[in-house]
Structure formats: structure tokens, C-alpha cells
Amino acid sequence: MTLPNMKPKRIVLFLVFLNAWVSNAQVTHKPRPDSIVEYSEEWENPIYTTPSHCFEDTFAPVKPEKLRCPHIFDDQNLGLTASKAKILHMDLKPEDTHFEAKGRLLHKVTYQVLCSTGFFGGRTVTRKVLETPMGDNEAQAYKAVDREFPYFPEPLCFWLRDNVAAERVFHFSTPKTVTVDLYSRKYISPDFVGGQCAKSPCPTHWPNVYWVGETQSPECPSIDTEGGHIFTKKDTHRITKAVVHGHHPWGLTKACQIQFCNEQWIRTDLGDLIRIEPNDGTSSLTLPKCQDNVVQMRGNLDDFSYLNHAIVNMAQRSECLEAHSSIVAQQKVSPYLLSKFRPPHPGLGKAHYLQNNTIMRGDCIYEGVAEISENRTTYRNLKGEWKKWSLSRGGEGYDGMTVGTKIVIPDLEKYQSIYDNGMFIPKLLGEVPHPSIVITYNQTDSIETGIFTDGKLLNMGVNWTLWPSLSGISLFTVASLILIWYCCCRVTPQALNYSIPMHTITSRGVEI
């Protein structure tokens, strides 16, 4: 259906959808080839990775001790192009969220004395305090006096004259601090008419009372201009971040444009305000208008935000090493432990799944996950494509993703306590490559050491019985054994050695 043939209601819906799509579209910037530079800075990891394509012919059984935790890359700029740019950023501090302006409330009053004199010289004196109108210019030009004590003037009295006035004008000045709206650069106070004022002096709800600020217009925080780089994707040319040496990176994947201090700024992913002027001759970058007027003003609290991905990497590697130690020691694995070996970076990586109680390992292409559907059956990658999760040939998901018929997203759900119980049920591995030393601690902290082979404890000479062997031999053999035992009883028996033969461990190549 073409646009001219659409009904009016459908046209309105189409325009609303088009406007929403345009407002959320990400800004692209294709730098000139001569402006591209080599630059290296670390960047955030994706929230989750999953295999999108696996090479099934590469999967083979792997022994538990041969498992390896994924490599953590230092450079996260694969697939990005860097170009020089001039970056202006506003020096916002946490206290700027309560930016205040000093001033005073100015009140003009008149102290009046009225005198009336009668025929016989009697006097009537009346004293009044009157509200006196005051103009903007008068309020702005008034200079505050440290100490000004009001008083009534001496009465002026004349015979047979009534209401002779003697007046004196005073200005009452009271210190008053108001809030500054850094978006519109206006003074904000409930005392003002309309709740705000663009320029001092500001009229108040009280008659003839003005608020006078130390400066006519609110001041804005300082602006720093530095040379930096902007990063764009090589394939889509979408802007991902801006970097200035000595400052944390500014993410621009969800950036938008906002008016702040009567100027247009780019609000970054985490709420900072910057402006970007590329050095390749193009104009300043403009982005879609923000849907709200919120600036987080993180300030110095976020100077270490660029270390977030490093902290996440260390935590993931520690969890992986603990999972590896547990699998090797117990010769058991659960989907939860297997999920710790998932690579945190997109690209070629090792994937694992369970098949017939054996860990299978092979090569897969991992991609970043940007969003997960409500029923968790599909996901959206960084390119905006909705796809289904890749499952192994046995129906189990890679990296411990599928438990029965339920899709479990490791790492994204572990802090929400919605893991299925099946994620934590350990499965005994069918193939045990070598004996393992298992140390158990009881309540008295004593240590019992045993050798496990195929899950059975080898007790040398302990709880051993002859009956299974005697049941299958002849009577003559039994009599011969009794005779030999009678002869051996005359010799003093030596103490049995119940120690564990260490050659058993050595001959099998135990790795401790």
C-alpha cells in the first residue's frame, strides 16, 4: 500500500513511527581516509556473548584438566576506526546538581509621621509604616548598607493644619540564596512570581519586594577544550565513543542532543556533556534530541569508570578458575560451572557442551548480545538482528545454556536468583583420566586423604574378603590353602602396611 492511498489514521501512525525511529537512530560519521589515525584505548565489554556459528567438525572430547579459561584481550578496538577531533566537555562536579546563586531580598518601606494641630494648640501625632513601590532599576542600582536602622522622623506640626507628613524611606535587605536551573539558566525559587526569573532583580509574591542577585545572569560551569579522538565502526560508520587523553572514555552508542546553559550539547551514555568538532573539515556532530532533560553530572566520581571492564574481566577469570578447580577435583560438572568458560569477547572462541557425560570442546564464532526477548527464546545482536540461540547437536545449549527445556542466560541472571535448579546439579563425568587427590575437611579440621579412581576408593588391605574368590575354586584347592595357612601361622606375622602406595600415583602421572 502506497502512502497516498493510506487512510488518515494510518498516515498518522506511520508518521509517529517514523519520527520515533529517526529520533532513536544512531549517528554515523565517515571520516576522511587522511584523518584516520592509529589509536589504542580499552573499551567496555558487551553485556553477554553467545556463539552464532559453530564448526561442528572441530568438537572433540576434552579431559577436565585440559580445560582452559578464555583469554582476556587488552585491546577492545577491533573493528573500530579512530579519527582526530576537538572535544569540548563541561567540567561538572557532583555539587553542581545543587547549583546556587547568592543574593538578597530587598524591601522598600516608608516611615511616616502625621501631625494635626487644633485651635488651642492641641496635637495629634500618628505614626505609620507604609509599603512603597520600587522599580526594577531602583532595585538593581541599590547598594546594600551593612547597618541601616529604621526610625520615625520628628513630626512637623503647624497651627490649624491637619495631617502634616514627615517621611523617611528605608530599604530592608535580607540575604537569600536561590537555585539556578543550568538547563535554561534561570533563577528558581518558590518566592518568585511564576517560580522562576530570567534576570535579576526578580519580583516576588510579596508586594514591593525584589530578589537581587550578585550577578544579573546565572553563570555556567567552565568548559574545557582538548584534542582527542572519535571512534566509528568500520562497517556501519556508527559512532561508538570519544576519548581524550587522561580522561575516561565517553560512550556515544545511546547519545542524544540536549540544551544546557542555553547551548546545545551531546549527552553521552552515562550523562556527561560534550561537543565534538571533527578535524577533517566536517561540521560539529549533531544527534537526535533527548527525550528528557536529565544530566547526571557524574564529575570526579567517574574518573575511574574506564576501569569497569577490567574489574569485570578479573571477576570473570576468578570465577572461571574456581570452576576449573572444582571440576578437576570432583570429576563432576554442572551447566553452571560449564558456563564460566564462555569467552567474554566477540569473535572466534572455544565453546563447550555436555554429551554422554563428556565435555565437548570446539571452535565457534561469538557475537555480542544487545537485547533478549521476553520469553528468552531469541536475542538481538549488535547489528539489530533477532536470532535464535545456537544449540549443540545433542540439543543442549553451548556453555551450559539449556537445562532441560528451559533457556538459561548465565551471568545475566545469577544476580536475579532465577536460575533453574538444574543449573547446579553436578553430573559425574564418564571418563576419569587419572586419580585425583580429594581433601575433605570435617568439623575438627582434620584431613582425610584418599585416592579416587572411577569414583571408587582404593583401600589397600582394608575391608578385603576372600569369599568372592573362594566361591569359584575346587575343594582340593581349598585344602591346599588351609595347609599353607597352618604352616604360616608358626611364623610371627609381620604388621600389615596400610599406607597408600605412592607408586600408583607416579605410574599414572597424577598432576596435583
Swiss-Prot record:
Topology, Intravirion side: 487-512
InterPro entries the record matches: Rhabdo_glycop_CD (IPR055447), Rhabdo_glycop_FD (IPR001903), Spike_prot (IPR002417)
Virion surface membrane side: 26-463
GO biological processes: symbiont entry into host cell; virion attachment to host cell
Keyword Transmembrane helix applies: yes
Post-translational note: Glycosylated by host. Glycosylation is crucial for glycoprotein export at the cell surface.
Signal peptide range in chain numbering: 1-25
Protein localization: Virion membrane
Keywords: Glycoprotein, Host-virus interaction, Membrane, Signal, Transmembrane, Transmembrane helix, Viral attachment to host cell, Viral envelope protein, Virion, Virus entry into host cell
Annotated membrane topology: Single-pass type I membrane protein
Top-level taxon of the source organism: Viruses
Keyword Lyase: no
GO cellular component, one term: virion membrane
Transmembrane intervals: 464-486
Main localization of the protein described in the UniProt heading: virion
Function field: Attaches the virus to host cellular receptor, inducing endocytosis of the virion. In the endosome, the acidic pH induces conformational changes in the glycoprotein trimer, which trigger fusion between virus and cell membrane.
Record's subunit section: Homotrimer. Interacts with matrix protein.
Family statement: Belongs to the novirhabdovirus glycoprotein family.
Protein name: Glycoprotein
Gene behind this protein: G
